[in-house]
Amino acid sequence: SLPREGETLEDIRADIGDCMRCPLCCEGRTKIVHTEGNPQARLMFVGEAPGANEDAEGRPFVGRAGQLLNKIIEAIGLKREDVLIGNVNRCRPANNRTPTSAEAAICKPFLLREIAIVRPEVIVVLGNTALHNLLDTKEGITKVRGQFKDYKGLKVMPTFHPAYLLRDPSKKRETWDDMKKVRDYLNKTKAER
């Protein structure tokens, strides 16, 4: 799923249109939640799917998990406007269930085109759904978190989803360790430019 020459994030949004490609369109979606942020971002965050707050506002990570993500971004010296934030799926599954692999497969090509356009230096995958869809691995987040992985020459850092951290705050320390690795890598590559 390669982007076309000169394609922009807005072009992808237009291609998605008023999407009816999978059952999520009719299951409880109010708004399609598109990837948002800096199209020249060096850092991208990818989550699972919108929740109720995101569905209502049409923006990714705006609920309690989003507030925590904002704090994580600020803790590594960046602002939300500096990064790109999206999800594997753009429509909310009913009752916040995990999207099926078939639903994810329909949305995933749009995410991969966005990554190909922006080419962020680091992609932080938040939780198992993002991990499994970007890296095509069956390993769980607990096993691979904190280790840089490769996606087409880009660094990928798997870590816990902020919603999980709200349920289990004891994992915040590990997430902070992961994010320090991201910060240090971005600082190092910036110094080398």
Language-model features: where?
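A polyanion-binding, active-site-adjacent surface
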Residues: 1-193
